Every structure is written in C-alpha cells, then in structure tokens.
Amino acid sequence: MYDELIESGDLPLARKSVLPGTGFFLPDTLEEDLEDQQTEAALEGADVAVIADPDADGLACVALLREAYDDVQNVPEPADDEADADDDASDEPLEDLEPTPHSVALIPASPHDVEDALARVAEYGDEGIDIFVCDLAPDRYEYVEEELDAALETADSVAWYDHHQWGDDVAQSVRDAGVDLVVGDSDEECSADVVYRSLEYDFNLMYEELAAVTRDHDLWLREDPRSDDLADYAYWTDPAEYVEVVREYGVDLPDWVQEYIAERRVEKEALIEQAVGRAELREIGGYTVGITYGRCSQNEVAEAMREQGADASVIVKPAGSASIRGTDEFDRCHEVAGKVNGGGHPKAAGCKPDIYDDMLDYANHWTTRGAVTKRVILDAFRDVIADAAEDPDEDADADA
C-alpha cells in the first residue's frame, strides 16, 4: 500500500473528518514490536514504571509521581516546526523512543491494552521495580489477571490509582492479587486527585493546582479555561513532552505552547463543525439521544448536541470506537458502554463494539458514516432504559 493512501495530514478536511489516522492502518505486529522496543528503552535503569492513559489526567499522574520520586527534569525546548505537527499522534505512530534519563518511566496505555503494558513492564522492568497504574480500569479481571500476576512477580509493589467506575468483583480481585488499589469518586475526583492524596509526599501548590485544573476538564466542569489548554496540549503533543512541560510550568503553559495550541485549534474547530453538522437526535424511552460521526473532539461535539436538546450524546469515530456523554438527565453512560464492549463513568464513557470482522466492515463503516455502530449503540440505550424502567428501585438506591 502506498504511504500517501494512509497519511491523513494533507487530506481535505471533509475527508479527514471521516477517515481514521495513519496508525489505524498499521499491522498490530508492527506496532507491538515498536511498543516492545519503546518500553524496553523507557525502562532501562528505571526504578518506577507508571502505566497511564496518555490524556491530561493520566499524564498529570505521571508528573506527580516524578515529583514525589524526585526524578530528573528534562524540559523540552520549543521546536521551530512545532506548529507544523500532523493532525494527531496516530499519524506519527513509528517515532522511535530512545532511553531517557528518567528513573520514573512513562508507559502509555489505553483502557483496551492495559494488560499488554503490564506484560511489557513484567518482561522489561528490573526486579524490584515499583509499578503504578493510573487512570485506567479493566472491564473484567480476567482481562488482566495473567499479566498482573507477572507484574507482581517482577515488582516490589504495585499500586493502582483511578477514578472510573469499577465493578465490585473486579476491584476485590485486583486487591486480592496484592495490588494497592485506590478508586476515587468519579463525580468528585480525577485520577490526578487520587494520586495527589494517596502519595505520602508534601506537594507544592503548583501540583495541587495541576490536579485541580485537570479535574476541571476531566469531569467536564469547565470553570477554568486553562483546563481546555491542558487537554488539547496533552492530546496533540508527545506524552513525554507534556509531562515535562507541566512539571516545569504548571498549568500556566508557556507562550510557545500557547501559540502551538492556538494554531491547532483552527482545524479542531473545523472538525467539530463537520461532526455537529452530521448530528441527529433520536427519541428513546423518553430521552433525547444525539448521535453523530467523525474524527473530532468529542466533548465539544457532545456539548453542541446538548445545546440542541440531547440528554445523552454519542460520537462514533472512524476507527470504530465511540464516546458516550451524558447529562444530569441521563447518567447511565457506563451502562450503555458496558453492553457494547466498553465502560467509563455515569456521564462519560467509551466503547468499541465488537462488530468489525474484516476491512470490508470498516469500509462500510466509513462510507455509511458509522451506521452499524450507531445502530448497536442506540440498541444498547434502549436496553439500558428499558432495564431501568423495569427496576425503578435501582434508581432510588442510586439517588439515595
């Protein structure tokens, strides 16, 4: 396949909006080999491994842990071509990761591959390493059981800090395995808050503010405009760079970062407009559900659908996943996601329905703007709403 067929950086906006990034098209084996190399390099000489979601919340956890362990700072310099970076990290998936000076290693992971990250740390980490898992939650214990056991054999200690919705059986199994698991209230705390209060370390005010502003975006409070800057910068830049920039500057990002964010937001807003323009509203069991498709910033698109009257919103992505956002009127997003291979919070969840068997299914996904994915997620809404109607006592217990 010609490289230009899968490089999306120079695509017209209308096409970029409906196609996934370059990383989607790379073979799993190629990515796995690279991730092995990157993890091995990151763990060389490291005393601590932090497996974290590479969003602003997960990366704030890494910054807090590096501060607590008095890790060396490696502050990046502004690059002349910073603003020329491609659309998102998935368009540059093969960037080599050289050994770093850090004794607290960052191992990025998504909710769908946390078990792979655990296995790599078990394989490449030194005996007696301390392992932290941050801002990630397994849907089922058996998904991580073997890999967690291997990590526990290698590590001196394993701590897991999170704020997502955990099943009681999953949490108990993780604790029974020997993990120090702390799960915060997803309506009150982000994962950075959990790390901040769990570590026996006297953080200065800069890190307290980092946790607070990160929470502002992660819980979608939107009371501090700096939280949008953190979220966008974390999404667009390299995770390692983000961690070191917020360690140096806190939440008041330097001018060169602000300029970079401002330039990237021009395209971000255009992609949001594309997705909002495709939005439809459906009535399901007394609730209005907004649904759309596109590569975009899901929170802003969900907010636009809420303003149009949606009680809940679904943003289906070209890669096959979807974001589900709720409101005070509908707070069962994690239940909907749980029916379609996902999970999350009552008002913010994600999923990737297990409906893609081959590339023809994905081709249909792109050309129909996610029609099948939309249908199965809307069916999940119907099931959740019907279940709630049959068991009103459960709602009363939840509100008590």
Outline where the language-model segments fall.
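Catalytic PLP-binding core of fold-type I/II PLP enzymes
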Residues: A155-Q165
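Short N-terminal binding/cap micro-motifs at the start of the first secondary-structure element
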Residues: A56-V62
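Active-site flanking residues adjacent to catalytic metal/cofactor-binding acidic residues
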Residues: A52, C134, Y161-D162
